[in-house]
């Protein structure tokens, strides 16, 4: 190696990408955008920072170079449907605040077309159907998340206009 040793290589890097092997209902999801799912998760604190987002937060490398870990992180994120439904309920509420801040909310495009397009893109074009029943459920419920996010943004905006509570 140009750095002389594995330790020297690590010193030259400011971050490491980790591929995630995502499992849904016990099945490794290999398609639909869920593999290799690289995340910058090991980095020097002065070389990267997390983006200021409530949902789907990612670290961004500010300086230096990042390597990639050889092995993937096994990520058993949603062992049951209840776990995933709880997740999409939480994340759709957080996402609603983000899209509401941008002035987006209820429209046929956001409530129907975006979720449908999300499902078609991930399930068919990105081959999510190759992940069997688990792939179908994952991509179907992800589309539901998109719909809920915009419906909840509308609900938040409606409550603000009326001066009432939306919870």
Regions found by a protein language model. Give the residues of each.
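Catalytic-site signature of metal-activated, phosphate-bearing donor transferases
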Residues: 1-4, 8-160
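Short polybasic linear motifs
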Residues: 161-167
